[in-house]
């Protein structure tokens, strides 16, 4: 009640209960059976008829269709009559609910929608705005232009080597100068819009936890096991209600060393590891796109472990 966060999220984020115990408590409170998404049978082709992000936002996910036509549904929120009717209408069948935690549901979504998530993370921008994407490095026209320019330069070097060298040096110097001037102008013009708002300690003290927004901190890691022992304690010192702060470590699936280093560092309960599905390009921006799929904060922060 103090923070306005769901009670189950408060318990887990404070480390008061484990996911397994929470699952049992929720099931007992809601009068539902416990559903272990890690071991229960699933029909992934059936589940993928829906949007994973939409299902996560609504705190439920279909698992499989039973022989009698009913649908097994995992839920991380109580089942009211209105909610039961809404979900039954969505799956167009009678439903059998099982209780899970919200983290269970997110891990289940990552497993079921792994290919879709990986594809969306790598290719969504190129499909939506090709001109803003670097997926295509050079067009055919650009390749032809560079080849032609190279041939002209080679001919000039062969015929007028000294004069060509002088021209190239001047051209590169002018290009460097233009870049420097451009960055300076952008910095000066942008500085006019900088806003600094000073907050006193008294104003901070008057803030109520209930009024604070929820934050997600995305921490992309790749072969960074050597920094984890310092990184985790530093992030754990963030002075913010843990039930309103989620820290997601984004680790490539095959990077076992980094994952083991995080486990060994014993991070707080509101720190989670998202295993990035295999795919190309294997970059931090792609990992961050995967993290966006699971982020639940009103505000989002990116923390680069290398910094």
Region locations from a protein language model:
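N-terminal, charged amphipathic alpha-helical interaction modules
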Residues: 1-13
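Polyanionic, low-complexity intrinsically disordered segments
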Residues: 13-90
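Short, surface-exposed amphipathic charged segments that create phosphate/polyanion-binding patches used
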Residues: 50-53, 109-117, 286-293
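N-terminal membrane-anchoring/stem segments of glycan-assembly enzymes
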Residues: 119-207
